[in-house]
């Protein structure tokens, strides 16, 4: 009887994992077929921008494809940005941290982000709303360079020109800006080196951000409410994969 019991326990474990993986399904609006933004081979759907080198000029290979995933060195500030603008969509992407941290954020909490509804000229950083990716705070909102959002507490936050303001994720504990930091109250990231699932629902001017199946933040009256999507290089090595966008059904 030991073998069947062992298989039964294993099955329960797999079912538990599936429950976690699909925990947000009831929160996701009906959507169409996926648009694969990254196919594991190249950056067909993206441009690159680096603060020191400009558009589509990456001499130091800050962005690359390694074993079917995107490698971001983090050594220069910049981003991968979609060539196309989007509105009303469900975005899925996975990320994991590498090891390196670099000036001006050497030794600080590893930092990146997905900026969406991006409008205006290419620069560091353009008008947008950000799905923050940072050790101890993944899921925060940042409103950048005129980007604006009304947070879950009903307070509207507008990012001043040339800078940004934050709305902490729901249930966030105290934060410390050091490499490797983890939220002692409600950490949403998996342990360092493991893949994390990020999900974004942008429906009209309403946005929801999920980290590993849990609602991390929610906002309304987003400005802008459409635009390009970018993935940051901001002083920390990390990897992205499985980037897919699903248009919401009308």
Show the residue positions of the predicted features:
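N-terminal secretory signal peptides that target proteins for export/translocation
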Residues: 1-7
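Carbohydrate-interacting regions of secretory-pathway proteins
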Residues: 24-250
